[in-house]
A protein has these predicted regions:
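General structural signal for secondary-structure boundaries
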Residues: 1, 13-15, 31, 83
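Active-site histidine-anchored catalytic micro-motif
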Residues: 1-3, 7, 97-98
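Glycine-rich beta-alpha junction loops
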Residues: 10-13, 63-65
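Short, glycine/polar-rich helix-capping loops at beta-to-alpha or helix-loop-helix junctions
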Residues: 12-24
């Protein structure tokens, strides 16, 4: 396991053993609070910088990074998460990045969603990524 960056994780939602494991494996973790402090553009740039000279990057858009108010259909979302706008901006910037070889969207349970809020947010993330891809 090398060159892993996690962006937007919840500060209180991760167990201490998970945090220790991430540190031991040199996983670069940026909390949602840190994203808000430095802005999503700077955060994405920093995460890509951490990945260094990796020729190809895979991006997992985990809907759990969103604040619970915006993602009732994401099983582990909670208060204090990212906004859909922040995640869409990240998706657009990552779509522009030539090293990104593929993406997926995870942690989405439509059966637990309310008024398709989370599903619509996931679709907006995908569309934002594709808009970035088209601008390459």
């Amino acid at each position: 396991l090398t060159n892993v960056a996690q962006v937007g994780i919840h500060g209180f939602a991760n167990a201490e053993p998970h945090a220790r494991w991430a540190l031991e494996h040199k996983i670069h973790s940026i909390t949602a609070a840190k994203v808000r402090e430095q802005g999503i553009g700077r955060t994405v740039k920093g995460a890509l910088g951490f990945l260094g000279r990796a020729e190809r990057v895979w991006v997992d858009f985990d809907m759990d990074v969103l604040d619970r108010a915006f993602a009732p259909g994401a099983p582990a979302s909670g208060p204090g998460g990212l906004s859909p706008t922040e995640l869409q901006e990240a998706a657009f910037l990552l779509g522009k990045e030539r090293r990104v070889a593929g993406i997926d969207v995870t942690e989405l349970d439509p059966s637990a969603d309310v008024s398709d809020i989370t599903v619509r947010a996931a679709c907006a993330v995908l569309l934002s990524f594709f808009a970035g891809l088209a601008s390459r």
